[in-house]
Amino acid sequence: MRVILASKSERRNYLLKKIFPEFETVVPEIEETFRGNNPETIAILNARKKAIDAGKKVGDANCMIISADTIVVAGNKILGKPADKETARKYLTLLSGTKHRVITGICIFNPFDNRIFSDFDVTFVSFNTLTEQQIEAFLSKETFQDKAGGYAIQEINDEFIKEIQGSYDNVVGLPVEKLKQMIEQFNELQQVEIYDITLPDGSGVGKCDGKVVFVDNAVPGDRLWIKIVKNKSSYSYAINCGIINKSSIRVEPVCPHFGACGGCLLQNI
């Protein structure tokens, strides 16, 4: 199967070669989202948007599109890619002497059969207290551009970094071990037919492996790809990993935040 990296990042290109020596690249064109209270959800949403846009560019090809989106979170503040040197300076000053999170959302998508699976990885990075001179010396190299949080970990030395907890590759931009696990899970996704819906939560109801399965964002008549996330003795819970055949009663949501706030949960009934 063809493997396509939906990114122009040289860092992600280098890291993906640890899994696939040969692959193609497609550059997605999206507007990244930073609205919302959950940074993990934001990173996943941006990764999914990249994968889907790349899928539109390659058509219905039977391939595995891999995309990622990395954000830095300091306290409750999400730090994206700085637009200019002044913003990068503010970011580094904010990170100085603190522990922050580096979150990478990952998405795997096959436009041929509409399988889509996403997850995230998180690494905790602690910075030493930085002097103004250290920050200015780093900024003078002009390497802060296109880097979440204003820095690339492979371009700074021990005078910046105090401790890393978690995947180093994740901080670079693509957590290789996490991606390997996701590829295995992607290849094990199952199909299910939805025949009912629960109230008041609105989960779709189907059967898989002889047990009732409750699936998010599904309506009667849908045929879906699913991943089981919780098993009970007589039933299980699963996430929707792509619609194979749409139900005749399914409609496209008017609100782009459908399913996130719950206000329009019953729209598809």
Question: Where are the regions that the model predicts?
Answer:
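A short acidic, helix-capping loop that chelates divalent metal ions and anchors anionic groups
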Residues: 32-37, 74-76, 265
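A short beta-strand-loop structural module common to alpha/beta enzyme folds
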Residues: 23-34
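Anionic-ligand binding patches
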Residues: 2-4, 39-186
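N-terminal beta1-alpha1 ligand-phosphate binding loop
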Residues: 1-21
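Residue-level signal for short segments within beta-strands and strand-turn junctions
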Residues: 27, 74, 108-110, 208, ...
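Short loop/helix-cap segments at secondary-structure boundaries that form the rim of catalytic
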Residues: 15-18, 35, 57
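Generic preference for hydrophobic
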Residues: 3-5, 25, 125, 194, ...
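Non-catalytic accessory regions of SAM-dependent methyltransferases
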Residues: 184-269
